[in-house]
A protein has these predicted regions:
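Beta-barrel outer-membrane channel/assembly domains of diderm bacteria
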Residues: 2-110, 138-151, 175-179, 223, ...
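Solvent-exposed loop/turn segments at secondary-structure junctions
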Residues: 31, 72-76, 116-119, 156-158
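Extracytoplasmic loops and strand-loop junctions of Gram-negative outer membrane beta-barrel proteins
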Residues: 36-39, 81-83, 122-123, 154, ...
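Flexible, surface-exposed loop regions and adjacent strand-edge segments
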Residues: 42-48, 83-88, 127-133, 201-206, ...
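Short, solvent-exposed loop/turn segments at secondary-structure junctions
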Residues: 76-79, 119-122, 286
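Short, well-structured alpha-helical patches and their helix-loop capping segments
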Residues: 92, 128-132, 163, 284-287, ...
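Signature for the C-terminal beta-barrel architecture of outer-membrane proteins
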Residues: 103-110, 118-272, 279, 320, ...
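C-terminal hydrophobic structural anchor segments
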Residues: 270-323
Length: 332
């Protein structure tokens, strides 16, 4: 006879009728034409892709907020893009975010669920985490004057045989240097637990490896204990709003190919055009490849090169963007 024991803690949020005035709604839609010329492949690739997201915020009390967002999805951890094909299939919609935010005090918040990434990333850096990645777990955000901190406990899989945890701590300082300049700097530790006990086939959303080194059994060769230094300076350059940014990572659990960085500049030109340039070099085991930027170098690690962004707001709610990647895959 098998014996099954189960324990659960259940949080129920009850509400009466909800009207439109009770909800803070947000929506975005993006169409993207994508052209890829990979010298390692015989053919170029052309794709038409869409991403749409619909979210809502409900304030249950002065201290408790509920956030829900649905998005197009292909079971991809780091992308909400849907590729338009000729199969006339229906696009998938998934739960992109669903979390509670509770104000423990004036300067301390608790987040629980599948949440918006709570960690500071200079100029929305995607060196470690893709912008579409929404972690699942528990997080605290704290502020005290010019000091801020973020603490997270992220879960990757509910199966006890494949459980991987990400424990994270970020401490930072934000300072208004003068009327035109603001600086923000942080140091973070992202500690993945037991990744090197598994192969990508049981960890990543599609079972593929994203640039990290593997051992003879097909498991990850190294675990990942990441040290991350981030810097962002907002100022004025020739009367134009400018942002300088630097993001660096080192995996102390790897013996080699353990470092990565990106650095760049963002300029707002004539109140309309926005131009961003960055250079990135991300070695094979500097970070967990399945979570880093899914577009740079085709996704994953072991890439270096340039990225150019040019954005023009046609109206307040409609913009046109051009992004150019000139990347090289490192040979090992």
């Amino acid at each position: 006879m098998n014996k099954v024991t189960r324990a659960a803690v259940i949080l129920c949020l009850f509400s009466g009728p909800v009207t439109a005035e009770d909800l803070d709604l947000n929506f975005d839609f993006r169409f993207r034409y994508e052209y890829t010329d990979d010298s390692g492949k015989a053919d170029t690739r052309n794709r038409n892709r869409i991403r749409t997201r619909l979210g809502a915020k409900y304030s249950a009390s002065e201290k408790l907020d509920l956030f829900v967002r649905f998005a197009t999805a292909e079971e991809n951890t780091t992308s909400g893009n849907q590729t338009l094909g000729t199969g006339f299939t229906v696009s998938d919609i998934g739960m992109d975010q669903m979390y509670l935010k509770y104000d423990l005090s004036k300067n301390t918040d608790l987040l629980f669920g599948k949440m918006k990434n709570p960690f500071f990333k200079p100029n929305k850096s995607e060196l470690i985490f893709d912008g579409d990645y929404n972690p699942k777990g528990l997080a605290f955000t704290l502020k005290h004057g010019e000091i801020f901190s973020n603490i997270g406990y992220i879960k990757f899989d509910e199966n006890p045989l494949q459980t991987i945890d990400l424990r994270s701590l970020q401490v930072g300082w934000s300072k208004n240097i003068n009327d035109l300049t603001k600086a923000k700097i942080s140091f973070a530790i992202y500690d993945f637990d037991k990744l090197n006990e598994f192969s990508p086939s049981v960890i990543t959303f599609n079972g593929k490896n994203f640039g990290n080194s593997l051992d003879d059994n097909g498991n990850y060769l190294y675990d990942f204990s990441l040290k991350n230094l981030s810097l962002e300076i907002k100022t004025s350059l020739m009367s134009m709003p400018a942002t300088f940014f630097l993001d660096m990572v080192k995996n102390s659990d790897a013996d080699q190919n353990d470092s990565g960085f990106q650095s760049g500049l963002s300029l707002v030109i004539s109140d309309k055009w926005k131009f961003t340039y960055l250079y990135k070099d991300i070695e094979s085991d500097s970070t967990f490849g399945a979570l880093t930027h899914s577009d740079f170098g085709g996704g994953g690690t072991n890439h270096k090169g340039h990225q150019f962004n040019l954005s023009y707001p046609v109206t307040k709610r409609f913009s046109v963007d051009v992004v150019w990647f000139d990347n090289k895959k490192k040979m090992t």
